[in-house]
């Protein structure tokens, strides 16, 4: 699914598109589902200004966060455990992002947050390809769903959320909130990362009723 957020002011206008890549592999035997998040910033008009607050918290924020800037990305990891690393790629100035400086938008830009260091170069053209493939995948999936005269948009959005909660091996998450605490600082933590049979059966039943079986 793709989240679109439009910003407009007297200075200008732009749209932010957030998505995780998802599409069929070239040999049609599986899916391309990397653990990464793209943010495509589509410039519309003017010279809008904004700041990027990049504040990663690896290892559950239990230690100081180290940020290293390379020519290709910003690498982040915990001071006492460097195994959990994140890589931020961007067409914008990495130094400006790290220092939270004001950015003036005059053309399309992108950001990519990944758990893996990329072998191939990442640029705006690569990002557009990932966006188009992901968009086509979700359009094809919704096209196979039943259509209704009333509340079709609401039903379609609900089905898309249920589809997001399904793993490629068939498991279905109980909720997208995953492991949010009941209250900040408290010990009670409702962990929804696992496949609960009751919740999963209800989600699967709904998808079978309203959509065509598809990967």
What are these model-derived regions, one by one?
Residues 1-212:
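Acidic, mature catalytic/reactive cores of soluble proteins
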